[in-house]
C-alpha cells in the first residue's frame, strides 16, 4: 500500500470519528427536562381528550334513543306498505275472477266455475 494514499484517508477517518457524537446518538440542544410551557400544554391536551371522549359518550347515548324511535317508525311504515301491497294483491285476485269479456256457454251454475262461483274472500 502506498503511504501517500493511505495517510489522508486515515486522517479523515480520525477526524470523522472525533467529531461524531458518542454512542452514535444525537444529543438535543435543550435540557432533558420538560419546560413549564410544555407540561401545561400536555395537561391541556389531556383535558381536551377527556372532554372529547365524554362528549362522544353523551352523543352516543343521545343517538341511541332517537335511533330506537326511528327504527320503530321505519318498521311501522314497512308494515303499512306490506298491508297495502296485500290489499292490492287481494283486490286484483278478486277482479280476475269476474266474467267480464269471457264466454260462459259450457260453464253451469252447478259446477261453481261461472261468475261469482269462486270467491277468494
Swiss-Prot record:
Disulfide bonds: 99-115
Coiled coil: none
GO CC, alphabetical: cytoplasm; extracellular space; perinuclear region of cytoplasm; protein-containing complex
Family of the protein in this entry: Belongs to the natriuretic peptide family.
Keywords in alphabetical order: Disulfide bond, Hormone, Secreted, Signal, Vasoactive
Signal peptide interval: 1-26
Transmembrane regions: none
Induction comment: Up-regulated in cardiocytes in response to stretching for 48hr. Induced by lipopolysaccharides.
Originating species: Rattus norvegicus (Rat)
Top-level division of the source organism's lineage: Eukaryota
InterPro entries: Natr_peptide (IPR000663), Natr_peptide_CS (IPR030480), Natriuretic_peptide (IPR050787), Natriuretic_peptide_brain (IPR002408)
Keyword Signal carried by entry: yes
Protein name: Natriuretic peptides B
Amino acid at each position: 500500500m502506498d503511504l501517500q494514499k493511505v495517510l489522508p484517508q486515515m486522517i479523515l477517518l480520525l477526524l470523522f470519528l472525533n467529531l461524531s457524537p458518542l454512542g452514535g446518538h444525537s444529543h438535543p440542544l435543550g435540557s432533558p427536562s420538560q419546560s413549564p410551557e410544555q407540561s401545561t400544554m400536555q395537561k391541556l391536551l389531556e383535558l381536551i381528550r377527556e372532554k372529547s371522549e365524554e362528549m362522544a359518550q353523551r352523543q352516543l347515548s343521545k343517538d341511541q334513543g332517537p335511533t330506537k324511535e326511528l327504527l320503530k317508525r321505519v318498521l311501522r311504515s314497512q308494515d303499512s306498505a306490506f298491508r297495502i301491497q296485500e290489499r292490492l294483491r287481494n283486490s286484483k285476485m278478486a277482479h280476475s275472477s269476474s266474467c267480464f269479456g269471457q264466454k260462459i256457454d259450457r260453464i253451469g251454475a252447478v259446477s261453481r266455475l261461472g261468475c261469482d262461483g269462486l270467491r277468494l274472500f
